[in-house]
């Protein structure tokens, strides 16, 4: 998993509340267990017309936001059924940070396991960031995970809180496998001691 230390990029505004996982990645895209290629299905029902052509009015289809790395979204983002394909689709599109006032718990935790930083801010700060994100190609935000700070295009900054363990994992690019490997020496030492003291179980 790639480390997340500091991210600077275009922020796309999505002022919609209760965006559920079916909106993020429709069920038609859940047949694969591959993490790549799902970016085309991100918000598919909003991004495309029934004939498969792009909906020019959807934010991620607008030229200024096609390469967005940050999504500023309405309250309760990621609600609905549990599907890890949702963060996979965001990541494959290129989005590594989602900012909202709240997230569904399962989606929130799945983000960290896949290298995406979900940030919770107050409604007042979300309104400010949504306004910043509405500036088109000038909607550049910098998310500094080391200092827990978001800097807007006008230079103003917003602080955010994050569980220290989750912060450590993102800063060091550690998913569940990475965390296990980080304890590799301790695990090997235990296995050797356990085998020596319980030879019948070896």
UniProtKB/Swiss-Prot annotation:
GO MF, one annotated term: 3-isopropylmalate dehydratase activity
InterPro entries per the UniProt record, alphabetical: 3-IsopropMal_deHydase_ssu, Aconitase/3IPM_dehydase_swvl, AconitaseA/IPMdHydase_ssu_swvl, IPMI_Swivel, LeuD
Statement: the UniProt record of this protein carries the keyword Transport: no
Gene3D superfamilies assigned to the protein according to its UniProt record, in alphabetical order: Aconitase, domain 4
Enzyme class: lyase
Assigned EC number: 4.2.1.33
GO biological process terms held by the UniProt record: L-leucine biosynthetic process
UniProt keyword annotations, A-Z: Amino-acid biosynthesis, Branched-chain amino acid biosynthesis, Leucine biosynthesis, Lyase
Pfam families the UniProt entry points to: Aconitase_C
Pathway connected to this protein: Amino-acid biosynthesis; L-leucine biosynthesis; L-leucine from 3-methyl-2-oxobutanoate: step 2/4
Keyword Transcription regulation found: no
A GO term from the CC aspect: 3-isopropylmalate dehydratase complex
Signal sequence segment: none
Catalytic activity: (2R,3S)-3-isopropylmalate = (2S)-2-isopropylmalate
Origin: domain of life: Bacteria
Family of this protein: Belongs to the LeuD family. LeuD type 1 subfamily.
Reported function: Catalyzes the isomerization between 2-isopropylmalate and 3-isopropylmalate, via the formation of 2-isopropylmaleate.
Subunit description: Heterodimer of LeuC and LeuD.
Classification via PANTHER family: 3-ISOPROPYLMALATE DEHYDRATASE SMALL SUBUNIT, 3-ISOPROPYLMALATE DEHYDRATASE SMALL SUBUNIT 2-RELATED-RELATED
NCBIfam families: leuD, PRK01641.1
Name of the protein in its database record: 3-isopropylmalate dehydratase small subunit
Source organism per UniProt: Rhizobium leguminosarum bv. trifolii (strain WSM2304)
GN (gene name): leuD
């Amino acid at each position: 998993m790639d480390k997340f230390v500091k991210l600077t990029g275009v922020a796309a505004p999505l002022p919609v509340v209760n965006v559920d996982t079916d909106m993020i990645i429709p069920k038609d895209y859940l047949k694969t267990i591959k993490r790549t290629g799902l970016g085309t299905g991100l918000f598919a029902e909003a991004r495309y017309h029934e004939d498969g052509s792009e909906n020019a009015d959807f934010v991620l289809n607008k030229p200024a936001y096609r390469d967005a790395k940050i999504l500023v979204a309405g309250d309760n983002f990621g609600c609905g059924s549990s599907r890890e394909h949702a963060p996979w689709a965001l990541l494959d599109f290129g989005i590594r940070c989602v900012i909202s006032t709240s997230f569904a718990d399962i989606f929130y935790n799945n983000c960290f396991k896949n290298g995406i930083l979900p940030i919770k801010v107050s409604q007042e700060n979300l309104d400010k960031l949504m306004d910043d994100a509405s500036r088109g190609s000038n909607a550049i935000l910098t998310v500094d995970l080391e200092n827990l700070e978001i800097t807007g295009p006008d230079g103003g900054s917003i602080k955010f809180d994050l569980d220290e363990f989750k912060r450590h994992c993102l800063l060091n690019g550690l998913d569940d496998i990475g965390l296990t490997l980080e304890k590799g020496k301790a695990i090997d030492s235990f296995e050797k001691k356990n085998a020596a003291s319980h030879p019948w179980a070896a």
